[in-house]
């Protein structure tokens, strides 16, 4: 498989699977020929510390032990037994340009080692998106992880799935479009794996529980070698394995007591990838969550 030179992640906190209910023209357009799902399984409990931590570390909360209070208080150890994606990439690619631009700064502070030379920034996402776009155009990063927080704020304030929550997803979709345009402006689209992911959803005005509206989330990716497909089975922690695979970096060996991040079936046409293992007994999902029926709203390929 072609190795990507750039991996860019747009994280939308609290969007869950509500993306399919919102007006998201940029999401629909960008990922129309990509791979996507509205039922990626979050980590349990469905809180930001546990979920973003699983994505960046490739392990479950029972292994990384991170939670909101912890990542807000303690910096991530530079010698932690579970290296972040940034540390794994830096070890394999010493000269890589790495960036972490997060509205919720505990992600960068409490989940990313501080000695890696990662370019970082934090402010409200309405201002941060401009800085993200400038960074993409100017630095053409090898790996950029971003987090937009206002959707989660709208869910807490007005209710997840409410009109105002869905409107904020629409606004985040505009930011997604700006970020993708920056990729085009930088001229790196032919070498970029571009991803969007939500950490969790919500119920009422909160989250942390295990209802479908809290635990099922949105993921989508597009790139030159990405196959157009509805991903049958995925856990949000799989973001780590997808990133390493795209950059041509060997992932750790799968272990139920350690690394449980995998490349979901269908994203890439590569029959050498390991068989996707059912980790529902570890993640708390229904066995083979791919059997859960759902409705997609991706714009069809006009050329198909």
In which residue ranges do the predicted regions lie?
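Feature captures the catalytic ectodomains and active-site-proximal regions of enzymes
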Residues: 1-304
């Amino acid at each position: 498989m072609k190795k990507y030179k750039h991996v860019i992640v747009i994280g939308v906190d609290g969007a869950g699977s509500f993306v399919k209910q919102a007006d998201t023209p940029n999401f629909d357009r960008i990922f129309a020929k990509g791979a996507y799902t509205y039922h990626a399984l979050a980590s349990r409990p469905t809180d930001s510390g546990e979920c973003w931590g699983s994505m960046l570390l490739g392990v479950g909360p029972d292994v990384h032990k991170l939670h909101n209070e912890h990542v807000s208080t303690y910096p991530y150890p530079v010698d932690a037994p579970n290296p972040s994606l940034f540390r794994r990439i830096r070890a394999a690619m010493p000269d890589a340009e790495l960036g972490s631009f997060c509205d919720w700064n505990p992600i960068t502070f409490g989940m990313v080692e501080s000695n890696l030379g990662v370019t970082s920034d934090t402010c409200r996402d309405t201002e941060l998106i401009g800085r993200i776009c400038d960074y993409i155009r100017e630095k053409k990063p090898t790996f950029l992880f971003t987090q937009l927080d206002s959707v989660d704020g709208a869910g807490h304030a007005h209710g997840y799935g409410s009109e105002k929550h869905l409107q904020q997803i629409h606004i985040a979709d505009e930011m997604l479009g700006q970020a993708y345009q920056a990729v085009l402006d930088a001229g790196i689209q032919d070498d970029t794996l571009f991803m969007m992911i939500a950490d969790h959803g919500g119920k009422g005005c909160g989250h942390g529980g295990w209802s479908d509206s809290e635990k099922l989330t949105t993921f989508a990716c597009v790139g030159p070698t990405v196959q157009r497909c509805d991903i049958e089975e995925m856990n949000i922690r799989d973001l780590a394995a997808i990133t390493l695979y795209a950059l041509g970096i060997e992932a750790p060996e799968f272990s139920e007591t350690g690394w449980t991040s995998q490349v979901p079936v269908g994203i890439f046409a590569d029959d050498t990838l390991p068989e996707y293992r059912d980790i529902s007994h570890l993640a708390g999902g229904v066995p083979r969550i791919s059997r859960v029926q759902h409705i997609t709203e991706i714009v069809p390929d006009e050329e198909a």
